[in-house]
């Protein structure tokens, strides 16, 4: 059975992907959706608002907050205080995730939190392709300026291949950028 009304609180990085992915999942599961884009991506939020308003039934999907006149809701806390949501999906920082979880707990609203974290990469001495490992580490860290929840935060490299790995990373940074 569908949960009912889902609230999707989207982050500023990847503003369309990380808003629309949960929206599609919720609608596919039979839920209607309210999307709360980030204030830090106001132009993307405005476009998302305009497109959803133009192409979606407002009883199925609508956008609130992020400075859109007429919504009457301009902060995340105000949105969460509405008590109308049956499930909340939040993508963002651990700090804000705690706030969302606390607000949801007040109303016994189930929530899904996709939070940033520490993402180590381990390159062992028996790594079959140090060049490929370096390439993937550099690409993963630099993609979207490193502003993604799955971006490598640090690399633990076995000392026997540390020099080779570092040289390969330098090569890939120069190649990509």
Model-found features: residue ranges?
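ALDH superfamily catalytic-core signature
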Residues: 56, 93-177
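General beta-strand structural signal in soluble alpha/beta enzymes
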Residues: 35, 63, 90-92, 111-113
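Conserved small-residue-rich beta-alpha loop and adjacent elements
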Residues: 1-55, 59, 108
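ATP-dependent adenylate-forming carboxylate-activation enzymes
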Residues: 35-51, 64-73, 124-128
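A structured beta-alpha segment of the ubiquitous adenosine-cofactor-binding alpha/beta core
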Residues: 63-89
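Conserved residues at the C-terminal ends of beta-strands
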Residues: 9, 67, 91, 140
């Amino acid at each position: 059975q569908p949960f009912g009304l889902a609230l999707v609180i989207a982050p500023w990085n990847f503003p369309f992907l990380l808003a629309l992915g949960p929206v599609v999942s919720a609608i596919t599961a039979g839920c209607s959706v309210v999307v709360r884009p980030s204030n830090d991506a106001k132009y993307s939020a405005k476009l998302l608002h305009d497109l959803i308003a133009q192409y979606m039934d407002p009883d199925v999907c609508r956008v609130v907050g992020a400075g859109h006149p007429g919504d009457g809701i301009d902060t995340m806390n105000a949105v969460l205080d509405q008590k109308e949501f049956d499930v909340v999906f939040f993508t963002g920082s651990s700090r804000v995730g705690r706030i969302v979880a606390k607000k949801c707990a007040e109303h016994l609203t189930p929530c899904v939190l996709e939070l940033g974290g520490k993402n180590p990469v381990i390159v062992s001495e028996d790594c079959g392709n140090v060049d490929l490992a370096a390439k993937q580490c550099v690409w993963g860290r630099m993609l979207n300026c490193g502003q993604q929840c799955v971006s490598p935060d640090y690399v633990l490299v076995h000392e026997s291949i540390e020099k080779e790995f570092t040289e390969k990373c330098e090569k890939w940074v120069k190649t990509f950028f």
